[in-house]
Amino acid sequence: MIRTLAYEGDPHIGIFTRVLEDIAVVPPEASADYCAALKEALGVTLVKTHVQGSSIIGSLVSGNSRGAIVSGLAYPDEIRAIEEYREVMLLEGSMNAAGNVILANDQMAAVHPDMDNATIEQIHSVLGVPVIRLTLSGIKTVGMAGYATNRGILVHARSAGRELATLESTTDLPVGTGTINMGSGLVGTGLLANSTGYLAGIETSGFEMGRIADVFGFVEG
């Protein structure tokens, strides 16, 4: 089975696609081979849409199996496409790149530390999980500095012990550090995963792949 992937030659697949357990939101122009790899590795239903007229879906969408948090600048037809599968919350204001600022699964959500209380309460209501403010390796865009599934959470290799402890206090899932695409700590930029499987950016090394498999509980070979 394919374990590494590129989006139009770009290894940062997490910027262009958002997996919400049983669905994957992908740009309409994604290639047939790219879409086939997602379906084979992750067993997902594909939701083909832009967000804000853009293909950087992973940066603009977050969520879990209950709900989706989408940039407040998304167009009505884009919102409707996602609403067929999830309750949608629009993330308004200057901090609207939901995929960058929210790390979520079905147990928890971690958000940019400067996010306001009212928005956090909305996220809690839509996703149905406790929400914490967090940095990872001091990085506020936790949605790209980590990747959460219902099997485990992979975070930036230089995450501090206190950051890991805060995250571990919200979940009973394994939390581990790692890198993607030959040394990038921004693991969310180059990873797509769910309870079924995972795909990493095409530049990801064998060692990095092994770490991903370990944190998410997949046995290689």
Swiss-Prot record:
Cited SUPFAM superfamilies: Pentein
One of the record's GO molecular function terms: ribosome binding
Alphabetic keyword roster: Initiation factor, Protein biosynthesis
Signal peptide interval: none
One GO biological process term: cytosolic ribosome assembly
Classification via Gene3D superfamilies: L-arginine/glycine Amidinotransferase, Chain A
InterPro entries (UniProt xref): eIF6 (IPR002769)
Protein family membership: Belongs to the eIF-6 family.
Job description of the protein: Binds to the 50S ribosomal subunit and prevents its association with the 30S ribosomal subunit to form the 70S initiation complex.
NCBIfam families xrefs: eIF-6 (TIGR00323), PRK04046.2-4 (NF003132)
Name this protein carries in UniProt: Translation initiation factor 6
Organism: Methanosphaerula palustris (strain ATCC BAA-1556 / DSM 19958 / E1-9c)
Gene: eif6
